Amino acid sequence: MGQKINPLGFRLGTTQGHHSIWFAQAKNYSDGLQEDQKIRNCIKNYLQKNMRISSGVEGIARIEIRKRIDLIQVIIYMGFPKLLLEGKTRRIEELQMNVQKELNCVNRKLNIAITRITNPYGHPNILAEFIAGQLKNRVSFRKAIKKAIELTEQADTKGIQVQIAGRLDGKEIARVEWMREGRVPLQTIRAKIDYCSYGVRTVYGVLGIKIWIFWE
């Protein structure tokens, strides 16, 4: 059987970098990981509650966390930063307070920055959110995939592969469907490939979306 490795972990140190940048002693390492997970969940939950928009896309490409002894710096890479910057200072301060409350950090300062990314639909996380929104609105999965592929073509990507698994279009038996456009060389380590795995709850059950995007 084919052994399927995560494309991001496979390329760490060549074309991919870490999303958490800090050091810790072995006994404190698990606490640091849990802290990172809390920060990411808190930011995503805040966006879901406060940024209701028609497309259902939060627009977070990735959240980078850098830690020093007295400072936690969080950089949110967003495709649509207007969602968070409309009431710029108030919203960011509110988000900062929510994260601080969740972490209960007394001795460390928290700093949240937002960076806008170009070509948002060239990032698999944002594209997966778009497809999930379409599936929740009961759009046919084939139509949703084709629309997503059209959006990535505008972002100058060299190839994309989209896979959806589950009870597609409400059918009784779960199955896996996929579509590829262009080249996606998963075996080539130096190929810059972005990957995302995303679960979406629909009226028929949970569907799993996987997206591979080949840049260069």
UniProtKB/Swiss-Prot annotation:
What Gene3D superfamilies does its record include?
3.30.300.20, Ribosomal protein S3, C-terminal domain
Q: Which PROSITE patterns match?
A: KH_TYPE_2 (PS50823), RIBOSOMAL_S3 (PS00548)
Pinpoint the KH type-2 domain residues.
43-118
Keywords of the record: Chloroplast, Plastid, Ribonucleoprotein, Ribosomal protein, RNA-binding, rRNA-binding
A Pfam family that the UniProt record links to this protein: Ribosomal_S3_C
- Entries under InterPro entries matching the protein: KH_dom-like_a/b, KH_dom_type_2, KH_sf_prok-type, Ribosomal_S3_C_sf, Ribosomal_uS3_bac-typ, Ribosomal_uS3_C, Ribosomal_uS3_CS
Q: Any one cellular component term from GO for this entry?
A: chloroplast
Single annotated GO MF: rRNA binding
Q: Could you say which protein family the record assigns here?
A: Belongs to the universal ribosomal protein uS3 family.
User: HAMAP family under this entry?
Assistant: Ribosomal_uS3_B (MF_01309_B)
Its assembly, as annotated, is: Part of the 30S ribosomal subunit.
Name of this chain's protein: Small ribosomal subunit protein uS3c
Source organism (scientific name): Eucalyptus globulus subsp. globulus (Tasmanian blue gum)
